[in-house]
Amino acid sequence: ASDVYKRQIIDALDHGKRLVVDEFDSKMHPLLTSRIIGLFNSRVTNPRNAQLIFTTHDTNLLNASLFRRDQIWFTQKDSFGASELYSLAEYKVRNSAPFEKEYLMGKYGGIPVIGQFERLFDLREEEYGSTDEQA
């Protein structure tokens, strides 16, 4: 993480501020992201209740050891392209459930529509053969 980013994290924790980060997973190593989330979730390192709000595509973060269900939110595009925001807490899910696995299976929505790419995959296979073959 850059020095500026580190200062923003420390400032948020020291003063109980809200830190908003777009594409949190693109800014640093996954081990660092988990540690930073831990800093914000700890009463010891975050006594002023600072908030970390971020977007990510890193499904490894969908983990009950990092987040409560009410801290995990998903987006889903409707037929008009508008995004709907909803919480994992809206689902009847055990706290110990494998959030990442169930998300990737489509249980909570928010999964891209792969069907839109099927024709592209078919065209590539027709032109170059199976896309599963090793190069």
Q: What is the meaning of each model-derived region?
A:
Residues D22-F24:
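Walker B catalytic acidic pair
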Residues S26-P30:
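Conserved D-loop-proximal element of ABC-family nucleotide-binding domains
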Residues R7-I9, L61-L62:
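Generic recognition of flexible, low-complexity loop/linker segments
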